[in-house]
């Protein structure tokens, strides 16, 4: 146990280590990209604004600022719904600093389709909490972003999803493992409804909880896959970074 603790401590100190695994896969004729991250080996963070207080808006501006700071972008994805000024719609924490409060009430659109949830990155766990559970448990999150709806909650699909829904878009989201050590970021590369998208997490990845990030504007960056999606400006960004050698 002592050796394991020392090993994990050393891993955390080393920002050059990454277990990030990105790949292409298929679920029921739907092509999707998945990036799997590991809490103790991947430097996973949330980003919103640059050092001048301006929203990054895209992966290129984030890459440039990271490069100027001696860091490299390995993976990135839009991470939660946002307003026209690119500010988060819901709860947002960056480097332990709360930028936006939790929104627990129902509302319009996918965000307000309760239950919605919060993706939390802490020092010893990565987890998706249903919003009311989050308020009850008050976990200590270094980073957090609220979005909605929950795709999968306690291994069950959101009750309002319809299998035959014709509302089909490119979509993206995140799921977390039962041991709270792994996060799975998924972007569908074909249009699909929320029911099918949620089943990628439930039936293919077998995760107990998954959260919808967005549709229409879904984007992913992967150095490993040489994938860099462009398009409309985005708000919060989740990313894996490492220090340059």
Role assignments for model-derived ranges:
Residues 38-41, 120-125, 153-155, 176-181, ...:
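Short acidic-glycine loop/turn motifs at beta-strand connectors
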Residues 49-54, 133-137, 187-191:
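Short, solvent-exposed aromatic-acidic interface loops
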Residues 89-105, 160-172, 176-178, 182-209, ...:
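Conserved, well-ordered active-site substructure
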Residues 87-161:
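Active-site-adjacent helix-turn-beta-strand microarchitecture at beta-sheet edges
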Residues 3-13:
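Sec-dependent N-terminal signal peptides
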Residues 19-33, 37, 42, 126, ...:
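Flexible, D/E/H-enriched segments
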Residues 17-110:
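Zymogen propeptides
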